[in-house]
Regions:
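Membrane-proximal amphipathic alpha-helices
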Residues: 45-56, 73
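Short, surface-exposed interaction loops/tails
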Residues: 128-132, 136-177
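Conserved catalytic core of two-component sensor histidine kinases
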Residues: 26, 53, 60
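N-terminal signal-anchor/signal peptide hydrophobic helix marking the start
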Residues: 15-26
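C-terminal juxtamembrane segment of a hydrophobic transmembrane alpha-helix
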Residues: 29-47, 67
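N-terminal leader/signal peptides at the extreme start of proteins
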Residues: 1-17
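Short, glycine/small-hydrophobic-rich surface segments
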Residues: 63-121
Length: 177
């Protein structure tokens, strides 16, 4: 019986790991995980912040360019047919705003899907929607909600859309909780 154990040792060798060695490796891996995982989380948040800032700058520039090219009228203050609307009606729907910034427009704000002699302005934002808000839920990240105040005193968010737009003053904000 003893000879059989010696034969097995020779056959398979005694190169296995001891329990102490395995515990040391597990502890080292645990320490590395404790250091690396928070760094990944921080860099993800930094990336979202950077994306949000870039998207806000692009949309604010688009809104200001629209304002300059459309006789000092912000997008959403006319219907997509180019008819001026009262400030109270501008908050009812964000559809004209989105169309006016993502399609070609005439000087009065009328929307066209193709560039023509009169619909020569825009599109100011690529695609059919606003860029996604990286902090919003996927289903609402590109949606826009129009605010109902010409003066923003306290910015409140409800998380129902990716963006909050105030057409009376051309202000756009991230709308996330």
């Amino acid at each position: 019986m003893i000879n059989q154990k010696k034969n097995l040792k020779r056959k398979f060798g005694s190169n296995g790991f001891t329990l102490i060695e395995i515990l040391i490796v597990v502890m080292v891996l645990g320490i590395l995980a404790m250091v690396i995982v928070p760094q990944i989380t921080v860099s993800t948040t930094d990336a979202k912040n950077s994306t949000l800032e870039t998207n806000l700058v692009a949309m604010r520039n688009a809104i200001e360019l629209y304002y300059v090219e459309h006789n000092s009228t912000y997008p959403g203050m006319t219907t997509d047919a180019g008819v001026a609307i009262a400030a109270s009606w501008a908050t009812a729907s964000a559809a004209p705003t989105v169309k006016q910034l993502t399609q070609f427009t005439e000087v009065n704000g009328a929307v066209s899907t193709t560039k023509t002699a009169t619909a020569k302005y825009g599109p100011y934002i690529k695609g059919d929607t606003f860029p996604a808000n990286p902090f919003s839920a996927t289903a609402v990240a590109t949606a826009v909600k129009c605010g109902d105040s010409a003066i923003i005193t306290v910015v409140t968010t409800d998380g129902t859309t990716g963006w909050m737009y105030y057409p009376q003053i051309g202000k756009i904000l991230a709308n996330h909780l």
